[in-house]
């Protein structure tokens, strides 16, 4: 089995929102990614609507269903509704995505930069996971590779974890990836032993993805946005997506 690519289109919305109006069109960009071979589309709507908005989520849900690819909605399950943002649970009720990835990011964070602390996020998180799974969605929890309680995600009811790969990307860029890869491989093995599927995401790129997949067993899906869109500025969107698909074809999921 080949690791699946879910393209995060948040950065398309950032560019659109910086000018106002409808261009670039998030749905058109997502359609181009799917045509180039992406296996799914990811969005992370935030309460401040800095990029993906509620109407984008609805439109992309319709597109992914029509194209028969997976839709993955990321978000903070604890963030309350506010003007223009109905809350993660309500967005998911309206769209029933194939996967919901829960992320503990605060309103002021520039980007997601840490996973759940299972020593604290327990009872309320378990209740929310149950509510999301009642929609028929697969639930994944964003976690740090060094979290000693990764197996706790299974006890809380999650189906998968998403390994936060920012530290790996930083280590790879500085030529010091080996020790970090060992940490991620161990995390993946612990997750697999607990019966959890393994996703990965954050700062993965054409430069570092192949090395990551070669060292970390069982990665079912990678979610890639910032690097892919950045590379698309030079390569074109179609070519950028195809480059990732080629990397994934060169690696196979192993237990």
Swiss-Prot record:
InterPro entries assigned to the protein according to its UniProt record, in alphabetical order: Aldolase_TIM (IPR013785), PyrdxlP_synth_PdxJ (IPR004569), Pyridoxine-5'_phos_synth (IPR036130)
Pathway: Cofactor biosynthesis; pyridoxine 5'-phosphate biosynthesis; pyridoxine 5'-phosphate from D-erythrose 4-phosphate: step 5/5
Chain sites annotated for binding 1-deoxy-D-xylulose 5-phosphate: 46, 51, 111
Location in or out of the cell: Cytoplasm
Marked site: Transition state stabilizer: 162
EC number per UniProt: 2.6.99.2
Reactions the enzyme catalyzes: 3-amino-2-oxopropyl phosphate + 1-deoxy-D-xylulose 5-phosphate = pyridoxine 5'-phosphate + phosphate + 2 H2O + H(+)
A single MF term (Gene Ontology): pyridoxine 5'-phosphate synthase activity
Enzyme class: transferase
Active site location: 44, 74, 202
Gene Ontology annotations for the cellular component aspect, listed alphabetically: cytosol
GO biological process annotation, one example: pyridoxine biosynthetic process
Keyword set, alphabetical order: Cytoplasm, Pyridoxine biosynthesis, Transferase
Function: Catalyzes the complicated ring closure reaction between the two acyclic compounds 1-deoxy-D-xylulose-5-phosphate (DXP) and 3-amino-2-oxopropyl phosphate (1-amino-acetone-3-phosphate or AAP) to form pyridoxine 5'-phosphate (PNP) and inorganic phosphate.
HAMAP family with a match to the protein in the record: PdxJ
Family listed: Belongs to the PNP synthase family.
Subunit structure: Homooctamer; tetramer of dimers.
Protein name: Pyridoxine 5'-phosphate synthase
Gene: pdxJ
